[in-house]
Amino acid sequence: KFQKNLKTLNFFLDEYCKDFNFVHILPFFPSSSDDGFAIIDYKKVDNNHGDWNDFKKISSKFNVMVDLVINHCSSSNELFKNFLNNDEPGSDFFIHRRNSSGLSKVVRPRTTNLLKEIKTKFKKGYVWCTFSHDQVDLNFKNPKVLIFFLNIIKFYLDSGALALRLDAVAYLWKEERTKCINLPETHSIVRLIRFLIQNYSPGSILITETNIPNEENLSYFGNNNEAHCIYNFSLAPLLIHAII
């Protein structure tokens, strides 16, 4: 009986997909919710899925895209545990707020409350949770958070990934009294990642996952200096509609 892991995927691709050259493997890291998009450990393959050797066997034969869940991580991630306990690394990796003042304009993709209350010996107040209370948003106003993810990007590229999908990247930067989506600082970070990728690993591909109106979506191409590709969520159903 086949198991749902990287070994099975490797067999399937070899057996049935030899004419394909590109594969997107959805998050295969330890996760606590949201179908893998609440990452507990960015550098570990979930034991149920295999290990990095299994991944490298696939990436040696196919161009592989992996998800970089960059806006948030799991509340079970060691970084968030360190944040709650004022330990390092992570003590200042998340958005710590006293109240919801200035947040009335924030765009909400989910129906859960934006802020999650925290109470520990070291920290009291609220943290920012765009998608769920198990997915805590990271604070990109802290340069250490950006450096952390640049190291993760290097690790993924070194492990054989060709393309990186920046998940929920439109929500990355937060400012009070704004919609907190598609802010200029977010585009600056995408440009920086593009610049570093094309210099460190020429030929690698950066893709933004932005489920937003078309004009705003297209802005993530920048001036040919942001994403190489962008997701067009409306295209797939429109193609099906055209066929039927």
Regions found by a protein language model. Give the residues of each.
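Acidic/aromatic-lined carbohydrate-recognition and catalytic surfaces
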Residues: 1-150, 154, 158, 169-224, ...
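Extended, hydrophobic alpha-helical segments in both membrane/secreted and soluble proteins
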Residues: 164-168
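Catalytic metal-binding acidic patch
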Residues: 228
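Short, intrinsically disordered, charge-balanced linker/junction segments flanking boundaries
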Residues: 241-244
